[in-house]
From Swiss-Prot:
The active site is at residues 94, 344. Its EC number is 2.1.1.192. Its cofactor is [4Fe-4S] cluster. Belongs to the radical SAM superfamily. RlmN family. Reaction proceeds by a ping-pong mechanism involving intermediate methylation of a conserved cysteine residue. Gene3D superfamilies: 1.10.150.530, Aldolase class I. This is Dual-specificity RNA methyltransferase RlmN. It comes from the Bacteria. [4Fe-4S] cluster binds at residues 114, 118, 121. Residues 100-339 form the Radical SAM core domain. The gene is rlmN.
Amino acid sequence: MSEKKINLLDLDRKAMRALFADMGEKPFRADQLMKWLYHFGVSDFEEMTNINKVLRQKLAARCEIVAPEISSFQKSTDGTIKFAINVGQGQEVETVYIPEDDRATLCVSSQVGCALECTFCSTGQQGFNRNLTVSEIVGQIWRVSHFLGFAKDTGERPITNVVMMGMGEPLLNLANVIPAMDIMLDDFGFSLSKRRVTLSTSGVVPALDKLGDALDVALAVSIHAPNDELRDILVPINKKYPLDEFLAGIRRYIAKSNANRGRVTVEYVMLDHINDSTDQAHELAKLMKDTPCKINLIPFNPYPGSPYGRSSNSRIDRFSKVLMEYGFTVIVRKTRGDDIDAACGQLAGDIRDRTKRLAKKRMQENQISVTMN
């Protein structure tokens, strides 16, 4: 049986140089190849004209360049584009491109589904299937960059920012998320500033400490409740890592980080008459007083079967004013792509149903296998 080829999109620069050293090649050759991959989107070794023919043949024999394919896409009236990305075995994840006047952000997924079961999030209701590989994470950026034309002028703004805020909890897939973000930041990779790559977490505290030791990127933290009692319901991982532990971990990360400029972004979804009273705003302000942050209020984006409603503009406004009285910078997030279910908390949609059908099929296959054995 032939040896499985190495997918070069799975390798950060350190791993790429190690591979080239194993082939008897100098490190700069690995850097050249990465530029072809990530600066120009080239996937055919024969097109890499500054790499000699013998090395191109060695690469073709041992390696491949495989990114997940775009299955379909929908474009919102506001220019937001939601992509369904095929990651094999009947599984898909969603990736969202959000253009603005001065930048274009890509919201990237880290897992198929999510194990955290946040009660206001469509992805959380999908259940967890598996972690994405490095190539499946960076492949989302690579494929969408191809869609946008890579270095060609197609009229669409090129990707300037990446947020790990798609499907999944990134800190539960650190082994693949860290090298993927390394590629995003690398000058020979996507060459993004560390302040333009953001990881969002619901509070896996030990993994947050590991991230701080390995990498410096912007951090967004999903708080969503001003106390443990309510957060236990909205964000069940709070039962394992309550707010005091999470906030201490956030402060440790801030102390190590330059990307965050001394403060993180707090994400707080606004749920009608659940977490949006002025009393709860006072409680949130007191909770966050020792953790340097700006606060991003996110109007809830309903999805089919959701038990929650979106806070009214007046309730959001009152909540925001209380926080500002305490001196916090407060931003009310503009909802983007909600007409195509691409807004915050809506990712999953039909994919959730397909994933559940796949899980059911696997269960049936396992039952058949057990019966036969």
